[in-house]
Amino acid sequence: MTRLEIVDSKLRQAKKTEEYFNAIRTNIQFSGKENKILAITSVREGEGKSTTSTSLALSLAQAGFKTLLIDADTRNSVMSGTFKATGTIKGLTNYLSGNADLGDIICETNVPRLMVVPSGKVPPNPTALLQNAYFNKMIEAIKNIFDYIIIDTPPIGLVVDAAIIANACDGFILVTQAGRIKRNYVEKAKEQMEQSGSKFLGIILNKVSESVATYGDYGDYGNYGKRDRKRK
């Protein structure tokens, strides 16, 4: 099995917010034992959903739960800079396109009880890949192996992928950056996700500052992943 190492800087960053994510983990546990497959999304890019996904998965693993973190943001992966491999790895897109077995894409990490499915190479048809039978087949195969499965999805305000993924999940969490996104866009994102049939578990207000007084704005639906990837 391929092994990934979480980079030291990311591990130190997660340590600083450990208590915060331990509290979120506890709230998830109290929400019900049936809530074990969770989609994490945001309205747009740069709000911290990938960091939230990683930190939550770390918290669950460190609490003794066998946890799988899936990088399903195949258009614009942030986790590729969080976990490093010594050699060539296969990821989610390889499996969804029929070019890898499930066992080929689940990677061990240097964190006990935490495994990761990398995103893989950027595909020409991300949404179509998620809609084929392989994604649900994967979830069915792994749901009884892990205590928790955390799926980092693309922003629901930019592409529909997150709702497709959430359809196979028990619940979803919406991450939003304080002072950046207008409330009505957050509410619209929540409604879009709920249409998938997945349960709304809550909103994480990220990057909070005492100076924040209003919500911002956003746009560019459909252009996600086509801009300079260095922005994220």
UniProtKB/Swiss-Prot annotation:
Q: Which UniProt keywords apply?
A: ATP-binding, Capsule biogenesis/degradation, Exopolysaccharide synthesis, Kinase, Nucleotide-binding, Phosphoprotein, Transferase, Tyrosine-protein kinase
| A Gene Ontology BP annotation from the UniProt entry | capsule polysaccharide biosynthetic process
What Pfam families does UniProt report for this protein, alphabetically?
AAA_31 (PF13614)
| Any single GO CC term annotated in Swiss-Prot or TrEMBL for this entry | plasma membrane
Its UniProt pathway annotation is: Capsule biogenesis; capsule polysaccharide biosynthesis
Q: What is its EC number?
A: 2.7.10.2
Q: Which GO terms describe its molecular function?
A: ATP binding; non-membrane spanning protein tyrosine kinase activity
Q: So what does this thing catalyse?
A: L-tyrosyl-[protein] + ATP = O-phospho-L-tyrosyl-[protein] + ADP + H(+)
Tell me which domain of life the UniProt entry assigns to the organism this sequence originates from. Bacteria
Task: State the post-translational modifications.
Answer: Autophosphorylated.
Class of the enzyme per the UniProt entry, highest EC level: transferase
Q: How is its activity regulated?
A: Dephosphorylated and activated by CpsB.
| Record-linked InterPro entries | AAA_dom, Bact_polysacc_biosynth/exp, P-loop_NTPase, Wzc-like_C
According to its UniProt record, which protein family does this protein belong to? Belongs to the CpsD/CapB family.
**Function (record text):** Involved in the regulation of capsular polysaccharide biosynthesis. Autophosphorylation of CpsD attenuates its activity and reduces the level of encapsulation. May be part of a complex that directs the coordinated polymerization and export to the cell surface of the capsular polysaccharide.
Q: What is this protein called?
A: Tyrosine-protein kinase CpsD
Taxonomy of the source species: Bacteria, Bacillati, Bacillota, Bacilli, Lactobacillales
